[in-house]
Amino acid sequence: MKLGIIGAGKWGSALHFALSKKNDVYITSRHYHDLKNFVSLEEILRLEYLILVLPAQVIGPWLEKHPLRKDHKVLLASKGIDIKKKKFLNEILQQFIPQEHLAVLSGPSFAAEVQKGLPTAVVVSSSNEILAKTYAQMFPDFMKAYVDDDVVGAEIAGAYKNVIAIASGICDGLKLGNNARAALLARGLVEMERFASHFGARMRTFLGLSGAGDLFLTASSTLSRNYRVGLGLALGKDLQRILNDLGEVAEGVYTVEAIIEIAKEHSIYVPIAREVYEIIHGKNPKLSIIHLLERNGDD
């Protein structure tokens, strides 16, 4: 199968490595021109099957500048919410291609481990079962791809877990212990599902790879950029300094802004996202996390 990857950051490069095991994979990027099978964007867009791996906040403007054809098939491998439009990325994409031509990639998958060929399991979600299976079959043996149809659940899980990962990093940075982190993650998973169910997502999505799997990975390892943002905030570092030191995009910083706005509009209770938002905007991290752990309620 021939397919094109748009976006050559760490995740795009890792997918290029993995998918090249079974397919003719071409990749394009503004910055990295020395990659194997690098071609121009014009050449990529002549292909039918694409994988979009751009930063979440770039996707909307990029699509407006480079509209896709109606017959393009797209696997969305980015995780985030458009902060400007307050829309999920699948909604942005459906302005350019039919819903049945869109699939979403989710699940616990650090780029560094995929790049090493380590065992990984992901989920390809689409309302079009044939499309989901087509993309799933492109993955190599070391990267098992399951098929599902809960596009909304997969996308929200992938975006929201970055916010919970920031909270987890704060918790660990404050040295509050494993018990506290476990409580935070359990409540975080409930919060993610509560938010997503408002938009039609299914609970089972959050109990599998797309939800619990991706959350537990991202919220417990220094390989996670969002977790490292939380660690930095716990140490009292300035957010901009943290992001500069990372040298990469930490989507949770932007996603939390969108979640707060969407939750407010739809009256959805999102206490962890709210505290992360307030910490990013200057609230004392220790007071915020302790307040979360001490609050009453079933969430």
UniProtKB/Swiss-Prot annotation:
PANTHER family: GLYCEROL-3-PHOSPHATE DEHYDROGENASE (PTHR11728), GLYCEROL-3-PHOSPHATE DEHYDROGENASE [NAD(+)] 2, CHLOROPLASTIC (PTHR11728:SF1). GO terms for cellular component: cytosol. Belongs to the NAD-dependent glycerol-3-phosphate dehydrogenase family. This is Glycerol-3-phosphate dehydrogenase [NAD(P)+]. The gene is gpsA. It is an enzyme of class 1 (oxidoreductase). It comes from Nitratiruptor sp. (strain SB155-2). SUPFAM superfamilies: 6-phosphogluconate dehydrogenase C-terminal domain-like, NAD(P)-binding Rossmann-fold domains. NCBIfam families: PRK00094.1-2, PRK00094.1-4, PRK00094.2-1. It holds the Pfam family NAD_Gly3P_dh_C. The active site is at 161 (proton acceptor).
